[in-house]
């Protein structure tokens, strides 16, 4: 038990390798994390079961841990969430209706994401806003001049700032000198906060958390003073104080239901969640393309076929519907997430339930590690292309004259955004953001690989690999940078 607990908390990569080995004999592996029984599950039927709404399994335990340890929610706030068993849907779960006047907390938050982030028209608006901001940054690169660039540095500054402004407006950066170094440090330590270790054991992450949340508090307070809820921008899809309508509605919901400190913690976690996934995935996707010039050219041809030019302004862009439907681009996107997103989807057993012949008792936890399914050779391997390696064409069906994108037979082994009622609400925007980013770069630039380098700039003797310290918690950034030379063509 001590070995399992210690390895689970300090070496998730090694622990998941042990689980994968054990799951060759059984789809369910039990271990103890301290006093808690945890069942690691795989297999199509089991994944379907934990992602299907059920009175026997609840996804809320993970979010309560995030609220407690990453947001920094107060005990009284956590009690209110625990007591709200009315569910996330429009109508309360029968038998769990709340008294009149009591807010349905899970439903309220879910409604904000569903209405203002997931809805097609609003996701498209945010994507367009992001693309315009990102394009404005790209045109600042010298035209027809070769320049050396570090890809990780580029994405962590230019892409991240465009995405942040699209979602949250410009004020976070304007109000907080040193915002980006602090944000990326918070992204690095957020998984450590999840374990809930006492401050005296590891004070560094708590200090970073407090400093980053203070930055977010400045943004919230400044926006509250500057924004007029009765003015002409009351229903605007974007304005400079809060940024997007989604951010404004989310902060409004939080200020009505949470303390100012917890509201700042929620905003900090939202910022981390958006940037710490889409930015490293875009970085990885371009790294894979640059490392394979033939694949780079093939993806560029697809993106050029979806490009457009405004007849009035001459501004170039893309037909989103056409771009997002390009088969090879979609295959590269899926392959990138398959290899570089590692999360443990977590559920709590609330009533006795049987999976694969095992009786799981209330209070137990179920975890489905996405990495195990996404590296399953039986599902993903192809002749000459093992599941452990990147192959951009892996998700194409080639029987027809034109390649077709397909995920047939793979969906239960691919869940980088989680699943069920707690699936990541930002997945639509994230996908469109990543695809637009790659399309903009491969069509606008000639890019050539120079070297793989360490973060300090020293040449590396190998390509980048997943940063193993973040496995199991997030989109995994590369542990090396890629130095390239590029030239902007237009």
Where are these regions (language model features)?
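N-terminal membrane-proximal hinge/A-helix region immediately C-terminal to the signal-anchor transmembrane segment
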Residues: 1-94, 413
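Conserved cytochrome P450 K-helix E-x-x-R motif and the immediately C-terminal K′/meander segment
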Residues: 8-17, 310-357, 370-377, 404-405
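Cytochrome P450
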Residues: 33-37, 125, 142-163, 177-178, ...
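Cytochrome P450 catalytic core segment centered on helix I
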Residues: 184-255
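Central I-helix of cytochrome P450 enzymes
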Residues: 247-302, 367, 426, 434
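Cytochrome P450 heme-binding "Cys pocket" and the immediately downstream C-terminal segment
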Residues: 295, 410, 421, 427-471
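Conserved cytochrome P450 K-helix/beta-meander segment immediately N-terminal to the heme-binding cysteine loop
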Residues: 368-404
């Amino acid at each position: 038990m001590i070995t399992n607990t210690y390895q689970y908390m300090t070496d998730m990569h090694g622990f998941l390798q042990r689980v994968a080995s054990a799951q060759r004999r059984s789809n369910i592996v039990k271990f103890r994390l301290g006093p808690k029984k945890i069942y690691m599950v795989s297999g199509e039927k089991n994944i379907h079961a934990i992602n299907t709404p059920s009175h026997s399994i609840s996804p809320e335990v993970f979010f309560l841990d995030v609220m407690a340890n990453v947001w920094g929610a107060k005990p009284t706030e956590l009690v209110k969430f625990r007591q709200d068993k009315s569910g996330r849907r429009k109508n309360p779960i029968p038998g769990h209706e709340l008294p009149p006047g009591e807010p349905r907390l899970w439903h309220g938050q879910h409604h904000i994401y569903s209405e203002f982030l997931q809805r097609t028209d609003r996701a498209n608006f945010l994507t367009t806003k992001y693309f315009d901001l990102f394009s404005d940054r790209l045109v600042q690169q010298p035209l027809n001049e070769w320049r050396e660039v570090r890809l990780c540095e580029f994405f962590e500054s230019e892409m991240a700032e465009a995405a942040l402004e699209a979602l949250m407006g410009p004020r976070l950066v304007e109000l907080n000198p040193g915002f980006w170094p602090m944000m990326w440090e918070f992204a690095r330590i957020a998984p450590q906060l999840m374990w809930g270790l006492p401050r005296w054991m590891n004070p560094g992450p708590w200090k970073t958390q407090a400093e980053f949340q203070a930055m977010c508090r400045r943004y919230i307070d400044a926006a509250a003073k500057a924004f007029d809820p009765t003015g002409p921008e009351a229903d605007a899809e974007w304005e400079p104080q809060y940024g997007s309508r989604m951010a404004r509605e989310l902060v409004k919901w939080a200020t009505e239901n949470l303390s100012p400190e917890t509201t700042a913690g929620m905003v900090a976690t939202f910022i981390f969640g958006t940037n710490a996934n889409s930015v490293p995935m875009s970085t990885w996707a371009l790294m894979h393309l640059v490392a394979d010039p033939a694949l780079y050219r093939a993806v560029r041809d697809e993106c050029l076929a979806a490009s457009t030019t405004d007849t009035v302004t001459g501004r170039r862009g893309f037909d989103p519907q056409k771009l997002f439907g390009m088969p090879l681009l979609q295959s590269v996107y899926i392959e990138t997430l398959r290899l570089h997103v590692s999360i443990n989807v977590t559920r709590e057993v609330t009533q006795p339930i049987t999976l694969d012949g095992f009786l799981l008792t209330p209070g137990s936890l179920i975890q489905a590690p996405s990495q195990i399914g996404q590296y399953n050779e039986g599902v993903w391997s192809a002749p000459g292309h093992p599941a452990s390696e990147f192959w951009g064409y892996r998700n194409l069906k080639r029987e027809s004259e034109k390649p077709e994108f397909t995920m047939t037979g793979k969906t239960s082994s691919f869940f980088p955004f989680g699943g069920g009622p707690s699936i990541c609400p930002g997945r639509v925007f994230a996908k469109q953001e990543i695809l637009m980013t790659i399309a903009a770069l491969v069509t606008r630039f000639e890019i050539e690989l120079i070297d793989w380098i360490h973060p300090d700039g020293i040449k590396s003797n190998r390509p980048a690999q997943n940063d193993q310290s973040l496995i199991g918690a997030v989109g995994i950034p590369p542990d090396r940078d890629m130095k390239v030379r590029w030239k902007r063509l237009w």
